[in-house]
Amino acid sequence: MMKRVFSISWYLIIVLLIGSCDQIFNSKDNDDTKEIFDEGRINPTLEKLDGYAPVQPFWSGFDAPEDVHIGFDEFVYVTDANGLHLLDRGDLSPRITISLDGATAVTQDRLLNVYVSARIDTIIESIDPTITWNLPAIFKIKNMNGAGPLTYVDTLIFPFDDASLSTSAAQNARLNRNSSFNYERVKITGLSILGDNTLYVTRKGPFNEITQVAAPDNTVLEFSRIRENGVLTSKMINVRQIRTLNPAIPSLRSGIGLSAISSFVASPQRDSFTDDRSFLIAQADQNVDIPFRVLWVNAVETVDGLVFQQNSSLLAQDTTQADGFLYEPNKFIKPVDIAYTADDDSYIFVIDQELNKLFQFQTNGQEGVPPPAGAEDQTRQILVSFGEFGAGPKQFNQPSGVAYFDRVVYVADKGNNRISRFKLTSDFE
């Protein structure tokens, strides 16, 4: 459907021709002003001085959106019940849609390849040629943004692309519909990219033994590009399963019912990125009491290689500086997505689906933003986290994804079938 696009400069030309002081500057109740607000300006009646204000219009027309991501190409990628959608950041051009069954998480690497987790139907002749299996998969897609012919350059299908299940016997053992460990019950829940285009994947499922050769289902997997004859190809291979995350016992280094992952690399594109392989994860399992559901896991180079350690420093909480903290026990109920801003602010956003709330933290674990100039208390962070159940401009209904770009926060508001957008009032010029 074509959209009518009005530029602010066009409105200013019109009102200048009309004359009159009120018409030149516009009032809050003026129809022109309201329409300008609808095209992306802050509505001043909706927000106090400090906090996140809705950036309208919100984007509708989705069917239970699961995730939202702003790529290095600066396009917006959204997954929902119909598959994967591409939008420009104003949602002004026709959307591009790829139909995918069960599309959930989406990310993009620095080479502009898009990765999306979904489901795939496949027949495994060695088991039974009459059975169609519905398995978790990750599709690697090139040129969805129109830079060339759209191409599926790789498809990772599980359990076959889990290096810890390296034999056909081990793989086929997980494909049994009479077993509680049947791999059709496994889900890929999160995707994130590192500076060298390595892919992090979060997975959850029923098999969580830690003494077996096979990695537990609740884990983080790492995929890198395959090198052939010294040349990197577009194909991916599983190079690591991060087994230091306990799949069943809560701690500062656990991975129970993993729902999301975020590295510390994010758009916009630049010449170089951090080589830090640390990450943030969310644990959404509702059958386990998990005091710390969002964790920062440090990747540390040692003489024995790369090890993954808990970030105990976030337990230090100065209540004279902030009222909330990332490592506050029982802070979250069902965190389902995380976003890191990778700009000068270095904010961390967490979406809690059960609380219908967007949380915002700094990298020191403190909740809130620094006080603006002129604030009476310059030592205490200002809480800007918000949300409750509903369909209003600062309400959510089962929010499931969060992204950030150029000081705008994007939320996949699943139950309201929309992408909501927000911006700090202090960031409006």
What are these regions (language model features)?
Residues 75-77, 113-115, 198-201, 273, ...:
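Conserved beta-propeller blade signature
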Residues 55-82:
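Beta-strand-rich domains and repeat architectures in extracellular enzymes and scaffolds
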Residues 28-63, 174-176, 319-321, 386:
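A short helix->beta-strand "capping" segment at the edge of beta-propeller domains
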Residues 16-20:
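C-terminal motif of bacterial Sec signal peptides marking the signal peptidase cleavage site
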Residues 56-61, 96-100, 157-159, 171-184, ...:
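Surface loop/turn motifs at the tips and blade-to-blade linkers of beta-strand repeat domains
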Residues 26-29, 73, 79-81, 118-121, ...:
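Short loop/turn segments immediately following the C-termini of beta-strands
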Residues 396-429:
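Blade-level signature of beta-propeller repeat domains, shared across WD40, Kelch, NHL, RCC1
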Residues 68, 106, 191, 258-264, ...:
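Hydrophobic core register within WD40 beta-propeller blades
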